[in-house]
């Protein structure tokens, strides 16, 4: 079998950042997949499932309610390796096009202090596995990275 695109990235060189993982043509539309890399693979500790789950609920809710982008959001969810998230948007975009959106999203998470949307037995299959304080920690750290975002954290290493 062929190696999938995400496994061709040198994870030993990969830093936290906001990357275009791939672009796919679906019918007449382009779908852009973003790699929202929070931790440095194989170097820094990975996120635990509880904070990943909290970030997933908060980011998905935020993005699907963001007036300029909500109609473009197809999916937001965690990477299996627990070092980040994927965001799929309808349209042909580059990292620079969405850095403000992602920064605003993670700022929202960093400042969030209410009940996590969908964190109930009725709404979620594992609602007790949430850690808002750690989600806020990772979000705050990621916002700090995006404050000075440049090509070093928006283009995959060669």
Listing of model-derived features with the role each one plays in the protein:
Residues 1-63:
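His/Glu-rich zincin catalytic helix
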Residues 76-148:
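Active-site-adjacent, His/Asp/Glu-enriched structural segments that form or flank metal-binding
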Residues 62, 121-124, 155-156:
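A domain-level signal for the structural core that forms small-molecule/cofactor-binding pockets
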Residues 42, 48, 65, 126, ...:
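Detector for Asparagine
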Residues 3, 13, 23-25, 70-72, ...:
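Context-gated lysine
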Residues 144-158:
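Histidine-acidic residue clusters that define the catalytic metal-binding segment
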Residues 41, 45-97:
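M16/MPP (pitrilysin/insulinase) zinc-metallopeptidase core fold and M16-derived inactive scaffolds
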């Amino acid at each position: 079998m062929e190696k999938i695109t995400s496994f061709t990235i040198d994870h030993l060189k990969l830093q936290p950042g906001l990357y275009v993982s791939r672009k796919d043509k679906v019918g007449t539309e382009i779908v852009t997949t973003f790699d929202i890399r929070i931790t440095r693979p194989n170097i820094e500790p990975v996120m635990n499932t509880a904070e990943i789950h909290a970030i997933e609920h908060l980011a998905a809710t935020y993005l699907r309610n963001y007036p300029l982008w909500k109609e473009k959001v197809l999916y937001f969810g965690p990477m299996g390796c627990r070092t980040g998230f994927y965001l799929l948007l309808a349209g042909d975009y580059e990292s620079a096009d969405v850095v403000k959106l992602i920064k605003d999203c993670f700022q929202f998470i960093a400042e969030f202090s209410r009940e996590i949307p969908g964190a109930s037995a009725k709404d979620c299959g594992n609602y007790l596995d949430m850690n808002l304080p750690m989600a806020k920690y990772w979000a705050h750290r990621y916002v700090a990275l995006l404050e000075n975002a440049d090509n070093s954290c928006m283009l995959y290493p060669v």
